[in-house]
């Protein structure tokens, strides 16, 4: 480990933890999307695919900072337990809430104390995206539980993912630029 990494040991460990978590979330949400399509919840599948792409962006950003600090980014991808789409949405929401309420705030506090602007930036981008994922998962759960047959969870739909920070939106008209990193809206990836 380089001197730079040694000086930021706690932040590097937090980055590794976040990298592994986001890498596993990508794998999990990809598997959940397949199950949602099988159950004909194509809108929920679109949401899982968009969230999976965002998590992939987060893991890439975390890995970049780890390498910048002289560390190595390696993730152990765990087997995914796939259940019903409703159960998968609830599991995804639980994971997002943990990241919002605990993990990323703690990691941001440590990075801020160490004045590590690159870590602050990658953690902030991930945290803000997780907030939109949690909102969207909550909406999907409510629609599934409510049993509305015309709800968006049944038909494939577009979601918009910032290629820089992973911010995710469910509407094209929301922004001219990413509200988190200022990336131009026209660069957003459309995920269906």
Give short role names for the model-derived ranges:
Residues 1-192:
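Non-heme di-metal
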